[in-house]
Amino acid sequence: MENNAPRRVDRRTAYTKNTVKDAMLELLAEMPFEKITVAALCRRADIVRTTFYLHYDSLTDVIKELADDAVLAASGTGSKNIKDLSILAREMNKSTDPELLAPYMSLLPVCQRVADDPKYKVMFRDTMVSDYILMQIYRSQKSDSIRQFQDHLGISGQQAEKLFLFVITGAFEVNKSMGWEKKQDWYEVQKVLLTFISGGYEKLEQYFAK
């Protein structure tokens, strides 16, 4: 009889991989990714090279898995509805006080919230590593976002894909330029950007509804 029960997670494997990923985050806080070596990572994780290569083919694989983890953590909370950006824009036009806006921060898309987790923040300060995160956000959010753009705006799949690419890369680069810190000037900038984006959505809806 075939056993269709899910396979039990190998705890030793999970522990080892988490140890390697934590060691990578520690090293990223000390040096650029391009200067990190397998030997240095193994020393920090207290494992031998054979163990490392049992789980990963390269250092890049560790980064990609960390990027997956960061995006997954951000995707588990908050809104996925593009309409909610209009709500946030309205609130920001009332006030840019961080305390007053705190209840609405979950309305931000993943590309805006992904660096909020202190555990992964160090990854965003390395240009090479942050590019992997952007690619992972794009891959993980692409299908759902394109569908929403098509449903709400009545545009083609190609138009929806390019609009999503424009929004996500723009938001990501603005956050990168501001050091991924949500200080007062970040709220002022976001007020302008979200008002611009939500206004564009509304105009597109009106245009294609004709």
Name each model-derived stretch.
Residues 1-30, 35-40, 44, 48-210:
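Alpha-helical bundle regulatory/interaction domains
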